[in-house]
Amino acid sequence: MAYQNQNLKTANFFWGGRLTAYEVSNMFSFFEKGFSVNVWSYENLSLPQEFTLKNAELILPYEELNKFKQNFQKSNMSSFSNLFRYELLMKESGWWFDSDCICIKTAEEFANLASNKPFVLGLENDTLVGSS
């Protein structure tokens, strides 16, 4: 896969269901720092005009959503989300963030960080790579 850097100032999120003020304010922090904000969903969400609603079907078919089970649960959104984010980043590039993240760096700082790297990972702590 060739390295793509055209979306270094795009923040991507996935959401299903109704967005609360908490998620919207967290996502809005990325817009305020200069990111384009894409919210990927299988639903027709009501979003602030600064955000772009993207059809999650372009990344993974809806049927995949409930295929992942863990400990006899009905479905495991965390497992699906992991697969979705990797597929998204292969197809669209840009950045992936969970909706509980708040942006404190500018889009320009993120773009500079990744300008000559094929990928960037965040650390959760000294021994774990974070995936949000």
Segments predicted by a language model, with ranges:
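N-proximal low-complexity "stem/linker" segments adjacent to membrane-targeting elements
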Residues: 1-13
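Short, well-formed alpha-helical segments that are part of the catalytic scaffolds
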Residues: 19-31
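Short, hydrophobic beta-strand segments that form beta-sheet elements in well-ordered domains
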Residues: 34-42, 95, 100
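GT-A fold catalytic core of metal-dependent nucleotide-sugar glycosyltransferases
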Residues: 77-128
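Active-site-proximal specificity loops/subdomain of glycosyltransferases
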Residues: 42-83
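Short beta-strand/turn micro-motifs composed of small residues
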Residues: 13-15, 41-43
